[in-house]
């Protein structure tokens, strides 16, 4: 994981390291990213993130920061939806970034909602409802390399997602960039 400034966020150095390293050691996946598109101009090399209306962002800094907002995860961003049917998508730009393992992390708590994750032919539902505020990650596995994953909220209860990760279960190098 490289944590840095806007050059890191834009994947300028890490993208080149990832490309060279994965050619040499195997393509392990794109790695951890903020869920969705947390800000205007958000760049991702190798994958394209998308989202429908209905999501708001709490950020570690800048105009999107809210001290009263949901907890922030490892990526420094949390995407929250309070409507049923809000979607986030992540698609591999080419076969170098296909994946068979997807991990989704978010904030848990008494009033939190649930999501449906679709990875190829695999569909699973996960609830973020819990007795106390905490965090949880859920994994979805496919028997095939997939090029797209979709996350959809299932109710009007809030869902606050802190990160998602794509990997290949066959192993290889993963370099994540967070800035």
PLM region spans:
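Second-shell loop/turn segments in exported
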Residues: 2-8
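N-terminal hydrophobic targeting/anchoring segments and the immediately downstream early-domain regions
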Residues: 1, 19-20
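Glycan-recognition surfaces in beta-rich domains, encompassing non-catalytic CBMs
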Residues: 4, 22-179
């Amino acid at each position: 994981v490289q944590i840095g400034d806007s050059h890191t966020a834009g994947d300028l150095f890490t993208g080149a390291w990832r490309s060279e390293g994965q050619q040499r050691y195997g393509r392990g996946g794109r790695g951890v990213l903020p869920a969705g598109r947390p800000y205007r101009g958000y760049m991702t090399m190798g994958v394209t993130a998308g989202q429908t209306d209905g999501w708001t962002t709490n950020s570690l800094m800048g105009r999107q920061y809210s001290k009263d907002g949901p907890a922030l995860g490892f990526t420094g961003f949390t995407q929250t939806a309070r409507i049923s049917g809000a979607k986030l998508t992540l698609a591999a730009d080419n076969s170098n970034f296909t994946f068979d393992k997807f991990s989704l992390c978010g904030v848990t708590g008494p009033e939190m909602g649930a999501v449906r994750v679709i990875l190829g032919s695999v569909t699973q539902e996960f609830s973020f409802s819990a007795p106390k505020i905490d965090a949880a990650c859920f994994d979805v596995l496919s028997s095939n390399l997939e090029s797209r994953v979709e996350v959809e909220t299932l109710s009007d209860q809030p869902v606050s997602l802190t990160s998602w990760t794509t990997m290949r279960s066959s192993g290889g190098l993963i370099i994540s960039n967070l800035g």
